[in-house]
């Protein structure tokens, strides 16, 4: 128990030292602040470097992430077909694909997949 306590203390001290070193080494000087401003061939910037982001791109990205995660969960199901009951595997696969199709239908119905709005 004493050994575990000593190891935990040493790990804690090493963590604190590394965090303090990272803080000291990552300090920005006044000269580095010029790097944060946009640079356009030596001229002052005409427009802001931050452009507004269309909400349509954000919605498409969120829909892509949701369906991408669902597909990533669906792919390993092919590997477990050998070890599981065929009826259970079939019902689970159909249920999962059915949920995917319901989500796709809902997004299509809401008009989230139409770009010309």
From Swiss-Prot:
Belongs to the complex I subunit 3 family. The chain crosses the membrane at residues 1-21, 57-77, 86-106. This is NADH-ubiquinone oxidoreductase chain 3. Its EC number is 7.1.1.2. Keywords: Electron transport, Membrane, Mitochondrion, NAD, Respiratory chain, Translocase, Transmembrane, Transmembrane helix, Transport, Ubiquinone. It is found in: Mitochondrion membrane. It comes from Anopheles quadrimaculatus (Common malaria mosquito). It is a multi-pass membrane protein.
């Amino acid at each position: 128990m004493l050994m575990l306590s000593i190891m935990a203390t040493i790990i804690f001290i090493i963590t604190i030292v590394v965090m303090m070193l990272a803080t000291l080494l990552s300090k920005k000087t006044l000269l580095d602040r010029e790097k944060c401003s946009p640079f356009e061939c030596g001229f002052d910037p005409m427009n802001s470097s931050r452009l507004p982001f269309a909400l349509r791109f954000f919605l498409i990205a969120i829909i892509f992430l949701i369906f991408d995660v669902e597909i990533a969960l669906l792919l390993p199901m092919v590997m477990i077909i050998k070890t599981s009951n065929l009826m259970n595997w079939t019902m689970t696969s159909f249920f999962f694909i059915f949920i995917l199709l319901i989500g796709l239908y809902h997004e299509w119905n809401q008009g989230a997949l139409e770009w010309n709005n």
